[in-house]
């Protein structure tokens, strides 16, 4: 059988079974479209992640410390290692810019008629998250230095906020826009799971106007990590150390490795 005969037989088979052939062709088209959609979504997510990592800045070192200790009654008595790590890093200022816990919590944020629990999550065509409830972070007074953030209004978290368990917070530009509109948020009080927190500052937006890939990163609230005593939701096991440059990062890693031994 030559190629021409094989082609004729295949053609007669297709013509004789038009319905099945149409479904087969449709399935092929659907399969191709699905693959193209998946590839497009994956490429969009990859680009979004790269922009988000870039927005957080370079030379970040992740330090993980795990400690689970319980008393006879089952109460968690694990040691808080951050004060020791914080003090240790103060002696490494030649190499280290800052250090902070890297923790989050889930809570309902309310200001006026705005309520995070009723906010809907929305995505654009590139699957960038463009709206939704704010992400709630815990940090030290050096959180902004570790995450490439600058204060646009008010002030940053202070060391005394941590030490005195002050119920204050700094919010991102997108959170300020969604909850406060044109009103200056600095000095205003938000309720977080029923607890009053005063907004002391607003971080500058990290993305350009209209750039949805990092927009949701600015939909955030940062609390002193000691606020976890009233808000809960955090066992701090990960910490971020921000080095001055790549060479300093290697040196800092060596020193911190010695601290952890």
Describe the function of each predicted region.
Residues 1-32:
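N-terminal Sec/SRP start-transfer signal
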Residues 16, 58, 173:
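ATP/adenylate-binding site constellation spanning eukaryotic-like Ser/Thr protein kinases
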Residues 24, 28, 37-41, 49-52:
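Juxtamembrane alpha-helical signal-transduction segment immediately C-terminal to a transmembrane helix
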Residues 29, 62, 238-240:
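Short aromatic/hydrophobic contact patches that present stacked aromatics
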Residues 92-179, 199, 220:
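Short beta-strand boundary microenvironments
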């Amino acid at each position: 059988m030559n190629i021409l005969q094989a082609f004729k037989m295949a053609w007669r088979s297709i013509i004789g079974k038009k319905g099945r052939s149409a479904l087969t062709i449709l399935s092929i088209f659907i399969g191709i479209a699905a693959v193209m959609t998946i590839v497009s979504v994956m490429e969009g997510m990859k680009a979004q992640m790269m922009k988000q990592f870039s927005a957080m800045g370079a030379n970040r070192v992740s330090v993980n410390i795990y400690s689970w200790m319980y008393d006879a009654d089952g109460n968690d008595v694990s040691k808080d290692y951050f004060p020791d790590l914080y003090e240790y890093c103060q002696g490494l200022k030649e190499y280290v810019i800052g250090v902070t816990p890297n923790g989050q919590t889930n809570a309902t944020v309310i200001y006026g008629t705005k309520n995070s629990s009723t906010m809907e999550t929305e995505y654009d065509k590139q699957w960038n998250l463009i709206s939704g409830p704010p992400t709630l972070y815990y940090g030290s007074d050096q959180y902004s230095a570790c995450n490439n953030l600058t204060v646009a209004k008010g002030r940053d978290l202070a060391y005394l906020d941590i030490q005195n368990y002050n119920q204050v917070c700094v919010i991102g530009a997108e959170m300020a826009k969604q909850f406060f509109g044109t009103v200056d948020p600095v000095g205003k009080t938000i309720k977080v799971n029923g607890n009053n927190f005063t907004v002391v500052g607003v971080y500058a937006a990290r993305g350009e106007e209209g750039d949805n890939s990092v927009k949701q990163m600015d939909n955030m609230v940062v609390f002193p990590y000691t606020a976890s005593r009233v808000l809960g939701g955090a066992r701090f096991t990960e910490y971020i150390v921000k080095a001055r440059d790549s060479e300093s990062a290697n040196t800092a890693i060596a020193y911190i490795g010695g601290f952890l031994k």
